A protein has these predicted regions:
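N-terminal capping/small domains of soluble enzymes
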Residues: 1-96, 102-103, 276
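Catalytic cores of alpha/beta
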Residues: 25-33, 106-117, 168-181, 225, ...
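C-terminal helical cap(s) of enzyme catalytic domains, especially alpha/beta-barrels
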Residues: 34, 53-64, 197-210, 252-253, ...
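Glycine-rich phosphate-binding active-site loops on the catalytic face of alpha/beta enzymes
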Residues: 43-48, 125-132, 185-195, 241-275, ...
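Glycine/Thr-rich beta-alpha phosphate-binding loop at enzyme active sites
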Residues: 67-70, 75, 129-144, 174-234, ...
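Glycine-rich beta-to-alpha transition loops that act as phosphate-gripper elements at the mouths
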Residues: 99-103, 164-170, 234-246, 508-509
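Ferredoxin-reductase
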Residues: 300-379
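FNR/FR-type flavoprotein reductase catalytic core
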Residues: 364-508
Length: 509
């Protein structure tokens, strides 16, 4: 099948709805380069000014494949987005649909004028259900929808595609208003709701409520697409609950020109997504229905209570928090720690039994953790990520700085035959050294020479590598985690002696 969309013959009939995966230009470029089935790439919604959005948690699962979210329109602002989107290499058979929002008609116009030159089309977010004063608040008023659409059309020369809310008694009336304003196409639907989820007596989302998406909204999405097309005859991007080839066929049967797949991607790696979209396209081509078997309906987003038993201060801005039980997290995986009313952040577990983690004071959440009282009940969800699997005959070299030791300690502990390199500015910022020495050959460096080698940990690493034979170096696998400059410096040294495929890194932000 071929998909024609505003003068382009698309490489595929799918899009990923705004705000789900394609939230950064690096990811957008990856989709352009590796996922041809996604013919329309939709950006996250962009406003006039930078916006932080809501504190985590921003996503909750209330049933397998069914979610509520309240991200809160997080974005870097229009001017920064112009620079970022302008760097993209958009293939001739793809369509870059830039989603925009505003708090007024005038803001929509200003954002549209800025972003149109770096876009193939503009999606007007008139349907976000969880950001007060934006989106749905405007999209439920036909006159406002008509006026905003007309005002944007008057200042740009690319297609304008309003995204409609299902949270209205008559979506056909809203669709007709958009068409009267000059809309070139429509997108239906955005999330339902807002809805509410709770865990252990607390609202999960920091916003309290959020838009509902996933399998549960499919029947409403299909109904809305049919009503919108019947009312306007415009091309429609159909979104809401599609996860299988049967769902996609239902959207096409309803009249959709392009189909959005979003919630079905939750929990997938980029490689998983490539395989999923490839299978979904093959299903359509050969009247099969296998792609849904790749959807992660097994994702566990439940929170488990843990109680703080120790808060050990390492120095002014580093602490080790130890909790009262074991959690099942393997080397290379991470968890989310949630404290109701404060927020949620991802952490590598320093140890799994008992569960402990390392905190560095970088923001409101971690600042509060520094003095978290013993006895505090918190909640953990996960693990997430992919466990590491070094080759059986590998010699592990773990390089850590800051709180990065938490990401690599379990690798050395669980697989053995390891060196651990730990770097810090000074001795008072070092921690967990005795435990490291019990499981690996330990190498310590401090910038001021107050402990171990006097200098950068990468200098110590280079010395160790230079004293090894080619055969020994060929068996090495490196795991780096720490501040970005340290990680990049470690990678540079490692590439002097070993192949890039032997190196695995994570930046500790």
């Amino acid at each position: 099948m071929t998909t024609q969309f505003f003068g382009k013959t698309l490489s595929g009939p799918f899009t990923i709805p705004s705000g789900i995966v394609t939230t950064a230009t690096s990811i957008i470029q990856y989709v352009f380069d590796h996922m041809p089935e996604v013919g329309v790439v939709t950006t996250k919604s962009i406003g006039l000014k930078p916006r932080l959005g809501n504190r985590e948690p921003v996503l909750s699962q209330y049933a397998p494949g069914c979610f509520v979210n309240a991200v809160g329109l997080t974005n870097p602002g229009a001017e920064e987005s112009v620079a970022l989107l302008g760097q993209l290499r958009v293939p001739h058979d793809r369509f870059l649909l830039t989603s925009i929002f505003g708090g007024s008609l005038e803001e929509f116009v200003e954002v549209a004028k800025l972003l149109a030159p770096v876009s193939d089309g503009l999606e007007l977010n008139l349907s976000c259900p969880h950001a007060t004063g934006y989106g749905m608040a405007m999209g439920q008023d036909p006159e406002m929808v008509r006026a905003i659409t007309a005002a944007v059309k008057a200042v740009v020369d690319i297609p304008v595609i309003p995204k409609l809310t299902p949270n209205t008694p008559n979506i056909a009336e809203i669709a007709r208003a958009a068409a009267e304003g000059g809309a070139d196409a429509l997108c239906a639907i955005n999330t339902l709701g807002p809805g509410y989820t709770s865990a252990h007596g607390h609202p999960v989302l920091s916003n309290g409520a959020g838009g509902m998406s996933g399998k549960g909204v499919l029947p409403i999405a299909l109904k809305c697409v049919r009503e919108v097309i019947a009312a306007t005859g415009l091309p429609v991007i159909g979104c809401g609950g599609a996860s299988s080839a049967a769902d996609v066929r239902a959207f096409f049967d309803a009249g959709a020109s392009v189909v959005g797949v979003g919630s079905a991607l939750v929990g997938m790696t980029t490689a998983d997504m490539q395989a999923y979209f490839n299978t979904l396209q093959l299903d359509l081509d050969h009247t099969q229905d296998r792609a849904e078997n790749l959807v992660r309906y097994d994702i566990d987003m439940q929170f488990r209570p843990v109680s703080l038993v120790s808060n050990q201060r390492v120095c002014d801005d580093i602490a080790i928090l130890t909790f009262d039980r074991k959690i099942n997290v393997q080397a290379g995986e991470f968890i989310f720690l949630w404290i109701p009313g404060l927020g949620e952040k991802p952490f590598s577990a320093l140890t799994d039994d008992p569960f402990s983690l390392v905190v560095i004071d970088l923001g409101e959440f971690t600042h509060t953790l520094m003095d978290l009282p013993v006895g505090t009940e918190a909640y953990v969800r996960g693990p997430h990520g992919v466990p590491v699997e070094p080759p059986d005959d590998a010699r592990i070299m773990a390089v850590a700085g800051g709180t990065g030791l938490a990401a690599v300690y379990q690798i050395a502990r669980d697989f053995g035959n390891a060196d651990i390199f730990v770097g810090a500015r000074s001795e008072n910022r070092l921690y967990f050294l005795d435990e490291c020495a019990q499981i690996a050959d330990l190498h310590v460096a401090t910038d001021d020479g107050s402990s171990g080698f006097h200098g950068r940990v990468t200098e110590l690493l280079r010395e160790r590598l230079s004293n090894m034979s080619d055969t020994e170096r060929s068996a090495l696998v490196f795991y780096n985690c720490g501040p970005e400059p340290m990680v990049h410096a470690a990678e540079a040294v490692q590439r002097e002696f070993c192949k890039p495929e032997q190196i695995f890194s994570a930046i500790d932000y």
